[in-house]
């Protein structure tokens, strides 16, 4: 018997230990989304061990990414488990799915409340303290040369499959960044995004783009003209 229970965290879920009476039932086969970033890979592997060793389940890790996994879980009920999910990527649709009983959040996670946005490195802000708003950054593409075309500013975005890839592409268009001298840097993967930051930090180079926690660049709430 396969446990047809869709488990989805509203932030990040670690450890599937809240099965209640289901834990004593025959477990059967379970699929777990193995998302394309490191912390999600780790959590998927830990959940696999817990389910196999603790509950006798047959567990398969399947490739996943935020939006494709959410869509598949919502529409097809597969995979069964997403041990890590960024809720703000699809918060309206997620809340609706939870309200309708299509998905369920189980327990609080050890990693919650992470911010995300546009960032620069500390050494950049120290040298250019005026760069604290999106407008100030976008006026200086010369400070952030694109790795493939130094005549343009490089704006690093999320890997394919992350909802923030779409939102950052939309921001790129909304801010008319191409006309301001910018071009998107395709990071390709979570490792590629991380590596671009690490490389810039090691070399003392400037870096601008999307990430989880560095030096936050505020974006005004006024409507764009």
Give the predicted meaning of each segment.
Residues 26-39, 57-62, 152-156:
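Short, well-ordered beta-strand elements
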Residues 37-38, 58-75, 183-195:
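Short helix-initiation/N-cap motifs at beta->coil->alpha
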Residues 80-85, 205-211:
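Paired acidic/hydrophobic, glycine-rich loop segments that form the ligand-binding mouth/hinge
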Residues 215-225:
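Single conserved hydrophobic/aromatic residue that forms the stacking wall/gate
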């Amino acid at each position: 018997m396969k446990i047809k229970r869709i488990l989805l965290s509203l932030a990040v879920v670690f450890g599937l230990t809240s099965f209640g009476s289901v834990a004593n039932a025959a477990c059967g086969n379970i699929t777990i989304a193995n998302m394309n970033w490191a912390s999600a890979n780790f959590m998927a592997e830990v959940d696999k061990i817990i389910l196999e060793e603790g509950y006798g389940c047959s567990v398969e890790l399947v490739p996943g990414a935020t939006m494709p996994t959410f869509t598949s879980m919502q529409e097809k009920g597969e995979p069964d488990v997403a041990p890590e999910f960024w809720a703000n990527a699809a918060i309206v649709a997620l809340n609706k799915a939870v309200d309708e009983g299509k998905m369920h959040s189980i327990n609080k996670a050890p990693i919650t409340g992470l911010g995300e946005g546009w960032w620069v490195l500390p050494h950049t802000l120290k040298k250019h303290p005026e760069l604290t708003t999106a407008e100030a950054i976008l006026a200086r593409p010369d400070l952030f040369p694109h790795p493939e075309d130094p005549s343009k500013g490089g704006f690093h975005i999320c890997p394919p499959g992350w909802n923030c890839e779409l939102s950052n592409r939309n921001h790129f268009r909304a801010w008319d960044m191409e006309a301001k001298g910018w071009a998107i840097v395709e990071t390709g993967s979570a490792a590629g995004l991380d590596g671009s930051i690490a490389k810039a930090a090691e070399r003392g180079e400037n870096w601008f783009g999307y990430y989880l926690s560095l030096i936050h660049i505020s974006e005004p709430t006024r409507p764009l003209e």
